[in-house]
Amino acid sequence: MCRLVGVVASEVTEFGLVLKEAPRSLARLSREHRDGWGIAAHGHPDTIPPPSERSPHDGVWRVHKGTDPAGECNRFLEIASRSAGTVLIAHVRQKTVGPTSIANTHPFIQSGWAFAHNGTLVDHASLRARTSAERLAQIRGDTDSEVLFAFLLTRLDEAGATRVGSCTNAREQATRAIATATQDLRSQKAGAFNFLLSDGSSCFVHRFGRSLFLLERTPHGPPRMRDGVDPASTGPWTPRRHAVLVASERLTEEPWSELPEGTLLRIDRGPSPKIVWPDAPERVAS
């Protein structure tokens, strides 16, 4: 198993709360999920890498990874303290397929998309057979997760959603492609595959086989933390700020909702992040 955290916010937001301050932050969860960590942040000027570190496939994601347990890694704690943006995908790993290594640490980045997975797939060969040679050639690690990412990117390629200057309905094309792909995998009993997948403007969230919770935090709903953690530790909650959070576990005492098994949703970034439900069996249950 692994643990995921995703945030889509209406304005630049500091992510220290979910990464290290909350009682169920990724730093705390890494006590059991000790095989590496990764943070991918999008949407803040400081998240744009310098030219020497920039890849044409990275978009404007700023990615940091490590192989130590996050809560015991000074580098993670320092990065978590200053990580900010409008979109976050973060992950701590408990390995099931592939050794502990940077190449096997999530999130993975290709063609401007970031991806993190929680679960285990049962038939890699079948998934590879339905993945393009171009995407298979981009795999650098040993995980089933990276194969799943390559498979989903293949479906996005076929829908025209990964091309630079994609048409105005690329978001809907991407949604149809991801919905079809996840429905197929569920029907084939491909295994457990919770995931977060984002291009920085939208974030796809899927639950199948592992726990996943959602919280919509409105401009007038500041966080309420256990153990006396001050919400102001992550910066003031401004009158305009609106965010949607997704996590493998409830991070706070707020009214998180459990996503039903088989749910796919899309969170669109904007002045008021919008949740779109292309594939939600029963919506959410508190």
Map each language-model feature to its residues.
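Short acidic (Asp/Glu) patches
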Residues: T67-R82, A90-S111, A129-R135
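Catalytic core of PPM/PP2C metal-dependent serine/threonine phosphatase domains
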Residues: V87, R163-G209
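Long, charge-dense
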Residues: R130-D157
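Extreme N-terminus nucleophile/cap motif
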Residues: M1-D68, T263-R266, P271-A285
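Conserved beta-strand-loop-short alpha-helix elements that form
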Residues: C2, W113-D123
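A residue-level signal for conserved active-site and pocket-lining positions in enzyme catalytic cores
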Residues: C2, I39, I89, L148, ...
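Gly/Ser/Thr-rich active-site loops/lids in small-molecule metabolic enzymes
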Residues: I139-G141, G209-P231
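A conserved acidic, glycine/proline-rich C-terminal tail/linker
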Residues: G221-L264
